[in-house]
Amino acid sequence: MEPLDAGKNWVHMDVIEQSKENIEPRKAGHSASALAKSSSRNHTEKEVAGLQKERMGHERKIETSESLDDPLQVWIDYIKWTLDNFPQGETKTSGLVTLLERCTREFVRNPLYKDDVRYLRIWMQYVNYIDEPVELFSFLAHHHIGQESSIFYEEYANYFESRGLFQKADEVYQKGKRMKAKPFLRFQQKYQQFTHRWLEFAPQSFSSNTNSVNPLQTTFESTNIQEISQSRTKISKPKFKFSVYSDADGSGKDGQPGTWQTLGTVDQRRKENNISATSWVGEKLPLKSPRKLDPLGKFQVHCDEEVSKE
């Protein structure tokens, strides 16, 4: 056994262990040295000032990032810095959700990043804070973001599967299959793993699906959010509610009918949900017919002729 290198800065796990309950899980994991550094901070004025100085440095880089060949990387570095210094995730101090919102909206109409997996991964980080992820995935499909990436279909299908909606999860995978989601070998492996779980946990629906004469709905035109929300789920609801832009006359800013232009921010949703308390004495509640949820619209995908020929 080789001796330990005394010159290296070894991380004592006891330091991390003391604050592990305040660390938000990440698929990519956390840097041990960054965790130890953030866990050992006493939050003195000096430390806070240091963090603020570093944050302003990232903000200045963003202000001048438009002239760069790859402005997205500046945002990625900023997000990584936030996650390293605030492993607990979204807090008032970290501002993580606001940062994710700013980044995702910055490049929605930038064709350079439509199929950039780095940009898609930032959306996948943001979806963890969304009450109804179906709307976010529909928004991405509407703007042709990540439609050639296996990650998009994996994460979308995982959402339905976690709620026991195996057939809808299968629809998502079928879309990915037709789009030849990349890397395709990874996509195939993920789909095989999904079908094994489906057969194990819901064999009846799996059998009825494979024996069905009519093809399953693939447009998600009638996806019912209430149905999904009421389904038994193992995942607790995130803190933030997802809202979407709605144009009263049905036309988007660019003149296209029904164009889904943008998404509401957490701040906007909080203001909308902040109803001031008033006295109900003598008030009458108007009778209204049950409100129907607006359809999510078709699950549109970008069909590239070159991809179709492959």
UniProtKB/Swiss-Prot annotation:
Disulfide bonds, paired cysteine numbers: none
Region (Disordered): 20-63
Superkingdom assignment: Eukaryota
UniProt record, GO biological process: cell division; mitotic spindle assembly checkpoint signaling; negative regulation of mitotic metaphase/anaphase transition
Keywords (A to Z) from UniProt: Cell cycle, Cell division, Centromere, Chromosome, Kinetochore, Mitosis, Nucleus
Localization annotation: Nucleus; Chromosome, Centromere, Kinetochore
Domain (BUB1 N-terminal): residue spans on this chain: 56-218
Biased composition (Basic and acidic residues): 42-63
MF annotations from Gene Ontology: anaphase-promoting complex binding; ubiquitin ligase inhibitor activity
GO CC, alphabetical: cytosol; kinetochore; mitotic checkpoint complex; nucleus
Subunit structure: Component of the mitotic checkpoint complex (MCC) which consists of mad2, mad3, bub3 and slp1/cdc20. Interacts with the chromosome passenger complex subunits ark1 and bir1.
Protein task: Component of the spindle assembly checkpoint which is a feedback control that prevents cells with incompletely assembled spindles from leaving mitosis. Component of the mitotic checkpoint complex (MCC) which inhibits the ubiquitin ligase activity of the anaphase promoting complex/cyclosome (APC/C) by preventing its activation by slp1/cdc20.
Protein name, entry field: Mitotic spindle checkpoint component mad3
Gene that encodes the chain: mad3
